[in-house]
Amino acid sequence: MTIAENSMQRPSLTSLTRKAGAVTALALGLLVSGAYAKIDDSARYEPVAPTIDQARANILIARQLQFTHFRNLGISDELSGDVFDAYLNYLDSQRIYLTQEDIDALSRVKKHLGSALKTGQLQPGFDIYNLVQQRVIERLKFALGLIDNGIEQLDFTADDRIRVDRSEAPWEANQAALDELWTKRIKNAVLAQRLNGADDDAIEETLRRRYEGQLKRAYQARSEDAFQAYMNAFTGMWDPHTSYFSPRTSENFNINMSLSLEGIGAVLQSDNEYTKVVRLVPGGPASKQGQLQPADRIVSVAQGDEKPVNVIGWRLDEVVDLIRGPRNSTVTLEVIPANASDETITRTIAIKRDEVKLEEQSASKDVIELDRNGETYRIGVINIPTFYADFQAMQAGDPNYKS
């Protein structure tokens, strides 16, 4: 069962779907990169808060689960402990951010999550999310501090042991214990790269970029991130295949299932503070227009004749939302060309949006011939890269819908 929301935050129950593996988030194609610019030390995490629309959506989701799901599971405080554990497993599955002290402090909200979810009281779940995000930031800053001090300062003579999979490990007692754990994690990462032949300067640069990227993403947390995580911990109580999709996730899911989208047909990723073009979808509007090129970096996005919006430093999914749009509409991109000598050189590219067919994910067939003992055999081969079904076309009665 998939519980999805449209852009008005009203959830609706769609047909029973089972997710076979992770759903790739295709915007124009969404790929997340680990390359980011150095984080401003003065940056502060802004706690996220639930919205009225999310509270309403929560109530509707609770009703749908109670009255339309095949599993007859009531919503009460008896459910609270399981929701709490599932939520923490989602937010800190390896138990590397929170401490036992944190878990004990959260016990005050743990007991009543069930009744709160039934009535749309989301603040307890958001309090947990904000605490985890704050702990994530603290841990990443600690890691960056170790790297900035120089990895040569780390003691590699100690008889250290580290548990790689910590999903079943006990929570560390306090912040001091977490400091020790994270020091071991950094030392383990350094040793792994040394064994691969990297020198210390390269190792420091790699680790710094890794943790700065994670830190930037932590600062960019949004209310919808917390809501989706919390709702999935909640809906997962009914069965593993009951999921909540936010409007953005629902749209990406439909794109992947229908193998088509309306946009410009460009695969994007984050690169420092920019959104960079990775590749163009063959036959898509951007590919046909011919000006946008791989490795171009997007500076601003404009809709039709409207003023451009500067998108430097934006989250990748938010940039994608600006670039997507209905077919036959025009989006204008200001980009730094891949071959630009410096970042002050930009050009403006207007592209008319259209339907983009993701043919590379479609099933394909081929016939190969094999010679064996003087005989030629023709063998049919069917390649199915992914499972898909265009639900919208199917519901519209199109006899030739893609599936």
What are these regions (language model features)?
Residues 5-22:
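Bacterial N-terminal signal peptides that target proteins for export
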Residues 21-31:
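Bacterial N-terminal signal peptides
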Residues 89-90, 111, 125-141, 145, ...:
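PDZ/PDZ-like domain segments forming the peptide/carboxylate-binding groove
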